[in-house]
Structure formats: structure tokens, C-alpha cells
Amino acid sequence: MVLLVVDTQKLITNSDLYNFNAFENAVKTLIAAARENNVEVIYVRHDDGVGAELTKGIPGFEIYEGFGPQPGEKIFDKTVNSSFKGTGLLEYLVEKNVHTVAVVGLQTDYCIDATIKCGFEHGFKMIVPENANSTFDNAFMTGEQSYKYYNQFMWKGRYAECISVEETIEKMKKM
């Protein structure tokens, strides 16, 4: 098992996210539990390219202080929604013989959705801990509606096991 922390970058990790305090607490708790139980924590950052708001070299590109990686923890950069496409993550997980990926981070309706579905298609058991992903309101849905749609309907029982933070930690302890 690994804990995959997706796109928790300074530019977009803020109180405008749906249920921010619960999200922040869940992610911090899971990162600490993973480290305590020798579950590898892997980070992914999104780069929209030169001239975009979210691009390498600007302060907002770096990982949010509250979730920051420790020395030696892997960081993969991506340019598309999926954490698996063209990043080396897939090859790394296969090489390490990883079968289970717990996914946390941003944004529910973009990169988390793509990462969960692509991970599932690559044969990984995907775990989505409750309150450990979030998003913003958009033109069609509130952040809350997006969160509930994906976590309680789209992924659950199809692409991922959607469980509590506590259940996720129990799985970490058994690894």
C-alpha cells in the first residue's frame, strides 16, 4: 500500500475548498499514520505549463506546508489530470510491487477522479478515505455536490473502496 497525495499545492489548497477544515485534518492524519506505519507517502504535483497560474517555478506550485513531504519521499510531476500518464508513477508502483493505492488530495472532480479511474484500470485496488479529497464550486455544481457525487456515487463500489479515515489507517497497520 502507498498513500498518494495528489495536487495539494499552495495555489489551490485553501479555505475556498469544500469542507476545508475536515479535508486538511483528514489529509494530515493520513500522512502521519502512513509514516508511522511505514506506508510510503508519494506526492504528485500538477504543472499547467509556462504562463499558467499553476506552473513550476512559482511559489503556488509547491506543496502546501501542512502536507509537506519529508526528505526522501517521492514527488512526481504531471501535466494532465491522471497521476499515472507520463509521470513514471505507474512504473514505480509496478517495480515496488504495490497493489493498493490510497488517494487523497485535489481536486475531486479533476485529478482525483482521473487518478482513481486510471489506477483502477491499471489493476490497483484504489482506496478513497472520507473527507480526504475536495474541490471548489464550479458552474454546474457546488463543491459539496461534486464531492458527494464522486465519493458516494461514482467511485464507491465501482472504481474504489470509499471508507473512513479510521478504516484506512487500520488497513495501513496491516500492511
Enumerate the language-model features and the residues they cover.
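Short acidic, Gly/Ser-rich segments with clustered Asp/Glu that frequently serve as metal-coordination loops
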Residues: 9-15
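A short alpha/beta connector and helix-capping loop motif
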Residues: 16-47
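Short, glycine/acidic-enriched capping/hinge loops at junctions between secondary-structure elements
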Residues: 15-17, 53-55
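Active-site-adjacent betaalpha module
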Residues: 2, 29-35, 54-175
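Short beta-to-alpha linker loops that shape the active-site pocket of alpha/beta-hydrolase fold enzymes
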Residues: 9, 47, 132
